[in-house]
């Protein structure tokens, strides 16, 4: 019975649970992007009453259509217990907590949070789309993303490359739900950022791809300048061109040039040209370019090669014994110079730096030091600096001095050390004297820039003065200094010997100059003589052809005149400077003569009869056939081209007009030997200079030539000069005078040359 009761109770409880109202599906939290559709589910079991939705505790209404909320409605099948809330075009106002209620069953669902996401309304970079900046001035690029829910995240890009280091901040709007994000990116613009594009991208959950905006930079900057030199390395005094290349934004307004800080007035272009000196190595040349933003100044030094120049001159130094001394000497030169310190009259190098350090100096260190700078292949310069070392007096006079017996003598005591002596005293024999006169002795003191000189003057030097030692003692603040000086006698030569030697030397010098002039004259004269023909070994014999009747006593081989002439021209054609061929035309009564004078260029090498005797006259004269007439002396000097070397000699005639009487001609002397030389004279064409000794043409004198008489007159009467031997007497002694037997009176004078190889 009891068990049956338990079964009945259990069954009744199960039945009651099967018919109870409950939520089979409740609304849950949901997120939606603004503008999208959202559905909040609500499903009830075993309920057929009224269902309503609340928003943040506010009832939205009953039924499926919610007239107060046009975008809201309850959807689903009521028979199936579906009371879902649908929200279309979600807005920020829809962002709330929702609850489904079964009022008759007194049931409430759990609250569901609907979150509405809102993308940034706008993304903007302050100052865009083009931002003008100053180069070198830091600037913050600012990007703003407005009214986003949740707050937007901002990313920066520079020409597509993401940038780090931006700083972001958010600002909550008054609705308490949306936020504005501000991001700042710090940049330091340069002229290279001109045209650079910066992009700001903002994003949140509502728009994961994000929104972008970009700006472009326009950077104003002072001119960017490059200064160049051409050539880069020059010698002092050469020309250099400076070129100033510049870029700027905005445009360049002008150029200015300066050297060593001083403006160059006449330079206003981008190019400056000048001659450089050593100062361009130490004083820079600057180019300044300016625009509206500012100016840029660029400087440069020129690599000028120049000789050493002093920068710090060494100064004379005075110090005490035992002290340390530093001498300073600074030079500048290019290429880098070599510096040496030496002591005067010594080649030992003491230092190679700008400073010379001398430790614990003594008086021996006193003197002049030389600071020498050497720039290889450019130049050398030096400076001298004296060093004075204070100490006891040092007497630098000669230990032996000289004087002439009977004359005035001097004994000198010189102190060149520092400081100058306070006292100087002389002592000799029993005498002591500082200054003044004592008997024949006088002491004088003289101060000069190099030291102090004390002089002991002796009047009428005697033998005893040469036997005495002279003591010179000087004192200064450092102590005394002493020197012993010996006076010795100087031998003097008599004035007559000196004068005679001087005169003799002068005479010898004069004779030497005369001999030198004569030697040079003879050498110059000899150099103008013979010209050696350096040709083949050819022997040439010149044969004079004359009328047969005038030389009937001579016989020799003959040759064709035309052949000899051609050979002569062929051999002597290259020596036309040494062959003087002249033709004199002279009309005396009825005859016309041709005369030639020629210098033998072979110097007698081809003279095959040089051993024969020759007349003293070098002019070989030939008689021509002419009508009888009054004789006349025809004087002429020997030719300059007449030499003893065997030159061919041809006759010329004087053209001097007849005038007053003169002395009778002298017969020729005996024939001179072959080696005899006579004075060389010029070739003669006109001999008016012989007018001082003319012979009249109508005075009864026949015409004569030097050395040979004229043919007798037609009357066979001898003239006053017939005492001379016939012309044939000298025919064999005349050089190259070999007359053909076949010649006649009607033929003109010709020469014939025989050549032997």
Curated annotation (Swiss-Prot):
The modification Phosphoserine is found at residue 574. This is Kin of IRRE-like protein 1. PROSITE patterns: IG_LIKE. It comes from Homo sapiens. Abundantly expressed in kidney. Specifically expressed in podocytes of kidney glomeruli. A motif (Cell attachment site) lies at residues 405-407. Changing residue 573 to L: In NPHS23; uncertain significance; affects integrity of podocyte cell-cell junctions and leads to altered cellular permeability. Required for proper function of the glomerular filtration barrier. It is involved in the maintenance of a stable podocyte architecture with interdigitating foot processes connected by specialized cell-cell junctions, known as the slit diaphragm. It is a signaling protein that needs the presence of TEC kinases to fully trans-activate the transcription factor AP-1. Interacts with TJP1/ZO-1 and with NPHS2/podocin (via the C-terminus). Interacts with NPHS1/nephrin (via the Ig-like domains); this interaction is dependent on KIRREL1 glycosylation. Homodimer (via the Ig-like domains). Interacts when tyrosine-phosphorylated with GRB2. Disulfide bonds join 42-100, 143-200, 244-287, 329-371, 413-472. PANTHER family: KIN OF IRRE-LIKE PROTEIN 1, NEPHRIN. It holds the Pfam family I-set. Residues 649-679 are annotated as: Disordered. The keyword Protease does not apply. Gene3D superfamilies: Immunoglobulins. One of its GO terms (biological process) is cell-cell adhesion. The modification Phosphotyrosine is found at residues 605-606, 622, 625, 724. Residues 1-16 form the signal peptide. Belongs to the immunoglobulin superfamily. Phosphorylation probably regulates the interaction with NSH2. Phosphorylated at Tyr-605 and Tyr-606 by FYN, leading to GRB2 binding.
């Amino acid at each position: 019975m009891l068990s049956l009761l338990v079964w009945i109770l259990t069954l009744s409880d199960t039945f009651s649970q099967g018919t109870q109202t409950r939520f089979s599906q409740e609304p849950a939290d949901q997120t939606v992007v603004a503008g999208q559709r959202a559905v909040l589910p609500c499903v009830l079991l075993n309920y057929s009453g009224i269902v309503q939705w609340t928003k943040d505790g506010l009832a939205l209404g009953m039924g499926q259509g919610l007239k107060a909320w046009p975008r809201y409605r309850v959807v689903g099948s009521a028979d199936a217990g579906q009371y879902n809330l649908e929200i279309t075009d979600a807005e920020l106002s829809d962002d709330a907590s929702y609850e489904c209620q079964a009022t008759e069953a007194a049931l409430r669902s759990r609250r569901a949070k609907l979150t509405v996401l809102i993308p940034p309304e706008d993304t903007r970079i302050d100052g865009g789309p083009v931002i003008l900046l100053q180069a070198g001035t830091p600037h913050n690029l600012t990007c703003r993303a407005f009214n986003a829910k949740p707050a937007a995240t901002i990313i920066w890009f520079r020409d597509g490359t993401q940038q780090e280091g931006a700083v972001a901040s958010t600002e909550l709007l008054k609705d308490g739900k949306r936020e504005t994000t501000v991001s700042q990116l710090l940049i330091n613009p340069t002229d290279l950022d001109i045209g650079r594009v910066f992009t700001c991208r903002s994003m949140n959950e509502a728009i994961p791809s994000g929104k972008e905006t970009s700006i472009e930079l326009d950077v104003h900057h002072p001119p960017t300048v490059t200064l160049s030199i051409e050539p880069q390395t020059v010698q002092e005094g050469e020309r250099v061109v400076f070129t100033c290349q510049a870029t700027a934004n905005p445009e360049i307004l002008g150029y200015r040039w300066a050297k060593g800080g001083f403006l160059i007035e006449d330079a206003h272009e981008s190019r400056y040209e000048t001659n450089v000196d050593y100062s361009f190595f130490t004083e820079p040349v600057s180019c300044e370019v300016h625009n509206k933003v500012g100016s840029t100044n660029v400087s440069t030094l020129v690599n000028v090669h120049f000789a050493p120049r002093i920068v710090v001159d060494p100064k004379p130094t005075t110090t005490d014994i035992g002290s340390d001394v530093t001498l300073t000497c600074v030079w500048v030169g290019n290429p880098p110079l070599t510096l040496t310190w030496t002591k005067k009259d010594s080649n030992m190098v003491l230092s190679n730096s700008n400073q010379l350090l001398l430790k614990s100096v003594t008086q021996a260190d006193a003197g002049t030091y030389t600071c020498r700078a050497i720039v290889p292949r450019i130049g050398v310069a030096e400076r001298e600096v004296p060093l004075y070392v204070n100490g006891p007096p040092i007497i630098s006079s000669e230990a032996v001095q000289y004087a002439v017996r009977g004359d005035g003598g001097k004994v000198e005591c010189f102190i060149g050390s520092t400081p100058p002596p306070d006292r100087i005293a002389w002592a000799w024999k029993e005498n002591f004297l500082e200054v003044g006169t004592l008997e024949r002795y006088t002491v004088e003191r003289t101060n000069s820039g190099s030291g102090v000189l004390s002089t002991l003057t002796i009047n009428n030097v005697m033998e005893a003065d040469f036997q005495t030692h002279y003591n010179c003692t000087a004192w200064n603040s450092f102590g005394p200094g002493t020197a012993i000086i010996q006076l010795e006698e100087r031998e003097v030569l008599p004035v007559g010997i000196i004068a005679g030697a001087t005169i003799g030397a002068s005479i010898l010098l004069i004779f030497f100059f005369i001999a030198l002039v004569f030697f040079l004259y003879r050498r110059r004269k000899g150099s103008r003589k013979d010209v050696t023909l350096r040709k083949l070994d050819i022997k040439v014999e010149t044969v004079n052809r004359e009328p047969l009747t005038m030389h009937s006593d001579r016989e020799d081989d003959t040759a064709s005149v035309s052949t000899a002439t051609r050979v002569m021209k062929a051999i002597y054609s290259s020596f036309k400077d040494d062959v003087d061929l002249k033709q004199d035309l002279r009309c005396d009564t009825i005859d016309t003569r041709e005369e030639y004078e020629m210098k033998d260029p072979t110097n007698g090498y081809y003279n095959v009869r040089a051993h024969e005797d020759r007349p003293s006259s070098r002019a070989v004269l030939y008689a021509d056939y002419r009508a009888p007439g009054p004789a006349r002396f025809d004087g002429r000097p020997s030719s300059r081209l007449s030499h003893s070397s065997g030159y061919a000699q041809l006759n010329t005639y004087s053209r001097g007009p007849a005038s007053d009487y003169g002395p009778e001609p002298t017969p020729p002397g005996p024939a001179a030997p072959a080696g005899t030389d006579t004075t060389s004279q010029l070739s003669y064409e006109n001999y008016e200079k012989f007018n001082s000794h003319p012979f009249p043409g109508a005075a009864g004198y026949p015409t004569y030539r030097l050395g040979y008489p004229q043919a007798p007159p037609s009357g066979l009467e001898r003239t006053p000069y017939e005492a001379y031997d016939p012309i044939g007497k000298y025919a064999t002694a005349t050089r190259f005078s070999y007359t053909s037997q076949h010649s006649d009176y009607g033929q003109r004078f010709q020469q014939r040359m025989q050549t032997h190889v």
